[in-house]
A protein has these predicted regions:
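Nucleic-acid nuclease catalytic cores
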Residues: 109-203, 207-213
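Metal-dependent nuclease catalytic cores that hydrolyze phosphodiester bonds in DNA/RNA
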Residues: 1-119
Length: 213
């Protein structure tokens, strides 16, 4: 899957939220190192497994987006195992959707911050049980603090997109952790104070990025 290219109004290419986080946040490396070590000791090809996990997550996101907006997903480029696990994650999303009163306003929204010079793509802005939130779908085995930093940055993107008119309307955020092995989901809810922390951390990472040589 091709990476999204973000450009500002002067046609300058900008780094994405995930690139800035992954390239500058030191504490998010431990989990990946531990995961890689575990699979290497088991004789697994850790890079192959990591690539496969990314493809499964991408496919699950596509399935969710097509369900929300209508349409179908081409499965030709995916293996049977990737399709099976992505479908399991998708079924978890569908169960969450049926368990709650959900109204979607935006999905896969690609935005650029002219003020802070970065770009990002949000999974969804939706109303869940009467609360307007940012929603993010994750197929990872755990929830990590950098996800909250990511959401803090997305909130900034969204509020700039609406000229700050919607700042007070966003009530929080939800990370929906989707199981790839058996149908199910976990909801991780975050308040405005949590998003404020995430944005504070992201601005520090921006400073590091700006001062790199």
């Amino acid at each position: 899957m091709a990476h999204t290219i973000y450009k500002n109004k002067n046609d300058k290419r900008l780094k994405s939220v995930t690139t800035i986080i992954n390239g500058n946040l030191g504490w998010n490396k431990g989990a990946l190192i531990g995961w890689t070590r575990k699979h290497c000791l088991n004789g697994d090809d850790s890079m192959k497994l990591l690539k496969e996990a990314g493809r499964i997550g991408t496919l699950a996101h596509k399935m969710i987006e097509e369900y929300i907006n209508g349409g179908s997903v081409c499965l030709d480029d995916y293996t049977p195992n990737e399709i099976s696990q992505a479908k399991t994650a998708y079924y978890g999303f569908h169960k969450w959707f049926e368990d709650n009163d959900v109204k979607f306003y935006e999905t896969e929204l690609k935005l650029v911050s002219e003020q802070y010079q970065f770009g990002g793509t949000m999974d969804a802005v939706c109303e869940v049980n009467g609360r307007l939130i940012l929603a993010d779908w994750k197929t990872s085995s755990d929830i990590y603090s950098e996800y909250l930093i990511q959401l803090g940055a997305y909130r900034q993107l969204y509020t700039e997109y609406h000229n700050y008119d919607h700042w007070y309307k966003i009530k929080g955020a939800t990370i929906l952790k989707l199981n790839k092995e058996e149908t199910g989901y976990e909801q991780h809810h975050y308040k405005i104070k949590d998003l404020n922390w995430g944005w504070k951390m992201f601005k520090l990472l921006l400073k590091i990025q700006e001062n790199k040589r």
